């Protein structure tokens, strides 16, 4: 009989406005800047034994502003930049769709565009993550909602769009000033719940 996979907790991170500066559509690598504390935050998660997974809507693909190869290049550059701080991302997951705008097969409703939980559920399956012991950090209500719909706790950060936002239909489990503040709160919870 096969042994069941051991699961671990994770911290899911929105990308734009949470890890890196919000610049509208990140369509050039020279626009990419990590937010202060992002490297330290990811490194702290790594040291805790939790996985770190980026979950991001990238409708710019569907709108024809850039392609999936470019998104891969952005993620490689984020990994390189975080690596300089001794931090590692365990996985990047993105949704290229938009329900009302876009080209070809990218223009459609889907289960992966936040606030739908599809990307978190896929990552949990592929990376053996226990969602009930996990967290989703983001700067928008849809990030919080996606995490909570997947069974994780949702944390709203006041960077990116979060500066001017309160939670929408899902009240966050915590509101933090930035990613580092959010991670310190998570680690203060005892890593798992």
Report each predicted region and the residues it spans.
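Active-site neighborhood of HAD-like aspartate-dependent phosphohydrolases
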Residues: 2-53
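Substrate-recognition element of Asp-dependent hydrolases with the DxDx(T/V) motif
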Residues: 38, 42-78, 87-101, 147
């Amino acid at each position: 009989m096969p042994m069941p996979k051991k699961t671990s907790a994770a911290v899911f991170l929105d990308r734009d406005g949470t890890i890196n500066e919000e610049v509208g559509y990140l369509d050039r690598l020279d626009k990419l800047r990590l937010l202060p504390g992002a490297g330290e935050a990811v490194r702290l998660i790594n040291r805790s034994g939790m996985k770190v997974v980026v979950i991001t809507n990238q409708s710019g693909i569907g709108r024809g502003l850039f392609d999936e190869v470019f998104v891969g290049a952005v993620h490689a550059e984020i990994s390189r930049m975080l690596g300089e701080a001794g931090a590692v991302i365990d996985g990047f997951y993105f949704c290229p769709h938009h329900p009302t705008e876009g080209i070809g097969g990218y223009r459609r409703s889907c289960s992966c565009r936040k606030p739908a939980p599809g990307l978190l559920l896929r990552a949990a399956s592929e990376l053996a993550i226990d969602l009930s012991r996990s967290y989703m950090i983001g700067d928008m209500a849809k990030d919080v909602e996606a995490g909570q719909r997947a069974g994780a706790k949702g944390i709203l950060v006041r960077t990116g769009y979060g500066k001017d936002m309160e939670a929408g239909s899902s009240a966050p489990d915590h509101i933090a000033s930035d990613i580092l503040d959010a991670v310190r709160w998570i680690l203060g919870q005892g890593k798992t719940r």
